[in-house]
């Protein structure tokens, strides 16, 4: 039986501002990426998100981003590898404290937004992320874009495990990278088209690029976005589609 992990970014509320559909999404995913206070989230939200994930037996990962609340961590920043290392180490440590306090164990780290996208092609940034993981806990998995040479080389260097990720509702360029969110065709808004893409990736090992070509993708985890208007409906639809197609949903370390 084919097995795949379904992951989602949660814990993005901040103070009085609520974001996402965390409670409704949790039953349909196997792993979550928790914002650690730099691009979103706050200490109370981090604690609550961890506790809810443990109640649902969902694997927990840190979702470190750039210190950019206003831009939600989606804007590129001119930073050194040393700064990236510090940002990532700090945020992993913060979330790990909440996970341990709740009696759980962190499974993975997935960079957020611009930090993630820059690491896909920038070997120094990918290296800094992997080094931070290695120094705090080399047993943590790193979720990174499938086929990214920067992620592959960094995880091999530090002997940590890369979980290759694909996206349900994002379009791909011919080189295997995601279409920038600044482009109109970056998101797949039709649910049926997104589900067709996911099934192609999971069952057939490829995705169609925006140019019409085929790009090989060996995905081990699929990212769902939990903050859209129909996010819960979409998550449930993918969950049920996988079940109907004999695809088992399970976190990598379960």
Curated annotation (Swiss-Prot):
Q: Which GO terms describe its molecular function?
A: 5-oxoprolinase (ATP-hydrolyzing) activity; ATP binding
Entries under Gene3D superfamilies matching the protein: Glycoside hydrolase/deacetylase (3.20.20.370)
Q: Which reaction does it catalyse?
A: 5-oxo-L-proline + ATP + 2 H2O = L-glutamate + ADP + phosphate + H(+)
Which keywords are on file for this protein? ATP-binding, Hydrolase, Nucleotide-binding
Biological process GO annotation list? carbohydrate metabolic process
Which cysteines in this chain are paired by disulphide bridges? none
Query: Which Pfam families does the entry mention?
Result: LamB_YcsF
Record keyword Lipid metabolism present = no
Tagged with keyword Cell inner membrane: no
Query: Do you know which InterPro entries this protein is assigned to?
Result: Glyco_hydro/deAcase_b/a-brl (IPR011330), LamB/YcsF/PxpA-like (IPR005501)
Which EC numbers characterise this protein's activity in its record? 3.5.2.9
User: Which family does the entry's similarity section mention?
Assistant: Belongs to the LamB/PxpA family.
NCBIfam families from the UniProt entry: PRK05406.1-2, PRK05406.1-3, PRK05406.1-5
- Tell me how this protein assembles: Forms a complex composed of PxpA, PxpB and PxpC.
Q: What does this protein do?
A: Catalyzes the cleavage of 5-oxoproline to form L-glutamate coupled to the hydrolysis of ATP to ADP and inorganic phosphate.
Output this protein's name.
5-oxoprolinase subunit A
Q: What species does this protein belong to?
A: Bacillus mycoides (strain KBAB4)
What are the leading ranks of the lineage? Bacteria, Bacillati, Bacillota, Bacilli, Bacillales
